[in-house]
Structure formats: structure tokens, C-alpha cells
Regions:
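Charged, amphipathic alpha-helical segments and their flanking helix caps
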Residues: 1-25, 44-132
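Short, well-structured beta-strand/strand-turn elements
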Residues: 27-31
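A short, hydrophobic beta-strand-centered structural micro-motif
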Residues: 37-45
Length: 132
């Protein structure tokens, strides 16, 4: 059968966040490439829920990596600021951003020569329409 229907579905929140950040910061979705540049942000969806068929609420982790702790912290704070601005301007599917927790990991577990700061944020996004 080739019946076409229009559905409402979740957005790819990792990509939405990356797109919101790309003009201002170097941002990657999982997996982090082997040759990543710093400072950068790694975006990982770690949970979420559906609210009344209109919006999704996503739990997202932002991991900032840089050559020193001050730059990692600055990169993380800038990323959160850019996402809040995107939500306020409504230039993406992102409608609201709230920080649940943030802090320093000390050194990056993958590359101990780098410092790492992380935040777990909650992102509210509109559903998208798709024909299938």
C-alpha cells in the first residue's frame, strides 16, 4: 500500500541543538569524532517525555571540552546562552531551555589533556509534521 499520511513526531533534538549552536560554537552530536577541535560542545539526548501530543520535553547533556577549565566553563555558559536566545527568538523548534545541573568533570575521560564542563538541560520543543 502506498497511502500517504501526515504524522506529528518528535524532532531530532540533538541535531536541533547543534543547528542552534553551529553559527557560534563548534558543536557535535554523538559520537564525538576522533579528530574533534576544541573548544567544543558534545550534545547527547539522555531522556525525554511527550506532553499532550503538542510538545516534547527532552533531557540533554552538553559536554564542553577545552584546553583549560576556564575555556570549558566559558564554552558551556555560551552554549546555554545561545540556546536560550534561540528559544526566545523561536528560530528553531526549541521553545524553552532550563538548566537542571552543571559543573566540572575536571579532565576529559577520553582526552586527559583537556578540561571538561557539563550541564544537563531540559529542552522543550514543538513536534514536527512529516508525510510518510
Amino acid at each position: 500500500m502506498s497511502n500517504t499520511i501526515t504524522i506529528r513526531r518528535s524532532v531530532d533534538i540533538e541535531d536541533e541543538v547543534r543547528l542552534a549552536l553551529k553559527d557560534h560554537l563548534t558543536a557535535y552530536c554523538r559520537p564525538l569524532p576522533k579528530d574533534f577541535s576544541t573548544p567544543c560542545i558534545l550534545i547527547t539526548q539522555v531522556g525525554g517525555s511527550d506532553q499532550s501530543g503538542q510538545i516534547d520535553i527532552f533531557d540533554v547533556t552538553l559536554d564542553a571540552r577545552a584546553t583549560n577549565a576556564a575555556d570549558a566553563n566559558e564554552t558551556l555558559r555560551n552554549a546555554i546562552g545561545v540556546l536560550r536566545k534561540a528559544a526566545g527568538d523561536q528560530t528553531t523548534a526549541i521553545r524553552h531551555v532550563e538548566v537542571n545541573s552543571s559543573g566540572s568533570w575536571g579532565t576529559d575521560p577520553v582526552r586527559p589533556d583537556l578540561s571538561m564542563y557539563s550541564a544537563r538541560i531540559r529542552v522543550v520543543a514543538h513536534l514536527e509534521s512529516k508525510q510518510i
